[in-house]
């Protein structure tokens, strides 16, 4: 049985690409036709590509690999957080901080600072500090949590990136490529597929399309984890 059906993809509007004037010719092989000035994505290819990405993620997660979900555009923020949390992986759904991967040690320092403030709050230190100082610390914590909350448990570099709209996330893509971290991407008709290892040709602007495809990546992780649990139980 295939991982995803044509019906699911159609209902979520995965086939709607961008306007024909905003396209990347490298995406030509994934385009089925043009309708009313919009490119229509070949969903048979999307089905196949979802399957390839799913198998890669399942195998990676089955070997203990970690995946970082990245989607900072409005249409992706909620799905990225929900699905990454559902499968126990990491995410960035606000601004990508330059150096998140290539300057990992510095990012870890910021995470350490976030943990310090959290501990101060838990230990009741806030109760004995001047009110003004507490307000400042709470603001700092909020800001750090906003940008780093989804990666605060990420102790080392991820084994793969799952990116929604590589054009929007070009800094994340460039950092992953520099470090040879494989990238799975939801790639619309205006993107460059050559930068992505596992291309999922799809509409990256519709919330339902993004949710559907992101949930499939999370499902692959969960299937791998269930397989691990079953293997442990069998032992």
From Swiss-Prot:
Family per similarity comment: Belongs to the universal ribosomal protein uS2 family.
Name of the molecule in the record: Small ribosomal subunit protein uS2
Species this chain originates from: Geobacillus thermodenitrificans (strain NG80-2)
Gene Ontology molecular function terms on file: structural constituent of ribosome
One GO cellular component term noted in the UniProt record for this chain: cytosolic small ribosomal subunit
Leader sequence segment: none
One example of a Gene Ontology biological process annotation: translation
InterPro entries registered for this protein in UniProt: Ribosomal_uS2, Ribosomal_uS2_bac/mit/plastid, Ribosomal_uS2_CS, Ribosomal_uS2_flav_dom_sf
Keyword terms, alphabetized: Ribonucleoprotein, Ribosomal protein
Keyword Transcription assigned: no
Pfam families associated with the record: Ribosomal_S2 (PF00318)
